[in-house]
Amino acid sequence: MLYLEDYLEMIEQLPMDLRDRFTEMREMDLQVQNAMDQLEQRVSEFFMNAKKNKPEWREEQMASIKKDYYKALEDADEKVQLANQIYDLVDRHLRKLDQELAKFKMELEADNAGITEILERRSLELDTPSQPVNNHHAHSHTPVEKRKYNPTSHHTTTDHIPEKKFKSEALLSTLTSDASKENTLGCRNNNSTASSNNAYNVNSSQPLGSYNIGSLSSGTGAGAITMAAAQAVQATAQMKEGRRTSSLKASYEAFKNNDFQLGKEFSMARETVGYSSSSALMTTLTQNASSSAADSRSGRKSKNNNKSSSQQSSSSSSSSSLSSCSSSSTVVQEISQQTTVVPESDSNSQVDWTYDPNEPRYCICNQVSYGEMVGCDNQDCPIEWFHYGCVGLTEAPKGKWYCPQCTAAMKRRGSRHK
């Protein structure tokens, strides 16, 4: 998955190439303009002295002026060809970028179906200014902590909280607010009530305890990012203060390799079922999360016997409250039996680049514009632009050039006049 690095390496020389070609075009433009100025002066002198000189002189001067005009026209045509080459160069790089994006998207979809849509939406949200609700959510702990000022010790309680911790809380609060928007009012109340008893009984005094699976379980709409964040909060709540982290990338990798086995339920529910199936899916996720948390603490049952029993009772109450939001639990079983693997044939077919059907067609091959192309100098040519390979050219022609159809038509007209 080094598409970005490869593409950046590929376009590393593009600015220099464009600068050189634009410089060459500028020089040619100045050359054409100077030639046109000189020709205009010669034409004015020719008409001033035409009556004073002999017809032979007039014909000679007229032929010389016409020759210089044709040379200036060839230089202008060459400048246009250079502009077309620059356009094709940039267009090739744009098409290559689209191809690499399509491959990267397919690679992400193969691992987690629907993840690209979530990432694109998250990127758009990051590009836009943050909402006032999210800002209030992200910094809701700061004013409270600042008021806890101890005049005797002359320091605040936030001095020991790392800066990364606030950033992680802001990220998780954004996920929480997005998840709450996608859920309905009834299930949101049940989820928050049920899961508040079991998500963070390990260390409820920590600031991260306000984020739990109930607040993040928005169904399949939040996707893998939401569940990865939920698992990260659960994992970091049990760590020491100095080892806590909420890295979304690490959480997502841990989420993929964990024993939750969520691939089938999460990916297929977004496409096949509605609200009831997503609620039933989150019931299964909460049960798995609480059971895995209980298994991880089985080695120290003797020390935390009371804590384990309270978490088991709260897990059962959470399961019952979450189950009331779904119409049937059999939907989850049907989802788990379905597969989310992208077929290999579909993957290969999507890698091949398909042009826009609305893009205009050129040349005798009736294909879109690509590579180097040459234009027919016949103003009435129905095709106008041709690929070099289709008309047997390897370099830009000098002077005027006519396509095979126009050449044949001109020959036919010439034979008729004879």
Swiss-Prot record:
Protein name, per record: Inhibitor of growth protein 3
Which UniProt key words apply to this protein? Acetylation, Chromatin regulator, Disease variant, Growth regulation, Isopeptide bond, Metal-binding, Nucleus, Transcription, Transcription regulation, Ubl conjugation, Zinc, Zinc-finger
Q: Where are the transmembrane segments?
A: none
List the InterPro entries: ING3_PHD, ING_fam, ING_N_histone-binding, Zinc_finger_PHD-type_CS, Znf_FYVE_PHD, Znf_PHD, Znf_PHD-finger, Znf_RING/FYVE/PHD
Instruction: Give the GO terms filed under biological process for this record.
Output: positive regulation of DNA-templated transcription; positive regulation of double-strand break repair via homologous recombination; positive regulation of transcription by RNA polymerase II; regulation of apoptotic process; regulation of cell cycle; regulation of double-strand break repair
UniProt xrefs under Pfam families: ING (PF12998)
- Compositionally biased residues, Low complexity: 305-325
- Binding of Zn(2+) 1 occurs at C363, C365, H387, C390
Renumbered zinc finger spans (PHD-type): 360-409
Q: Which family does it belong to?
A: Belongs to the ING family.
Q: Name one GO cellular component term.
A: nucleoplasm
Localization per record: Nucleus
Q: What does this protein do?
A: Component of the NuA4 histone acetyltransferase (HAT) complex which is involved in transcriptional activation of select genes principally by acetylation of nucleosomal histones H4 and H2A. This modification may both alter nucleosome - DNA interactions and promote interaction of the modified histones with other proteins which positively regulate transcription.
Q: In which tissues is it expressed?
A: Expressed in brain, heart, kidney, liver, lung, ovaries, placenta, prostate, skeletal muscle, small intestine, spleen, testis and thymus.
- Answer whether the UniProt record assigns the keyword Ubl conjugation to this protein: yes
Q: Where is this region: Disordered?
A: 127-165, 286-325
Molecular function (Gene Ontology), one example: histone H4K16 acetyltransferase activity
Question: Where are the N6-acetyllysine modifications?
Answer: K181, K264
Q: Which disease is it linked to?
A: Squamous cell carcinoma of the head and neck: A non-melanoma skin cancer affecting the head and neck. The hallmark of cutaneous SCC is malignant transformation of normal epidermal keratinocytes.
- Where is the cross-link described as Glycyl lysine isopeptide (Lys-Gly) (interchain with G-Cter in SUMO2)? K148, K165, K167, K256
Annotated binding of Zn(2+) 2, by residue: C376, C381, C403, C406
Q: Where is this site: Histone H3K4me3 binding?
A: Y362, M373, D377, W385
**Bias (Basic and acidic residues):** 156-165
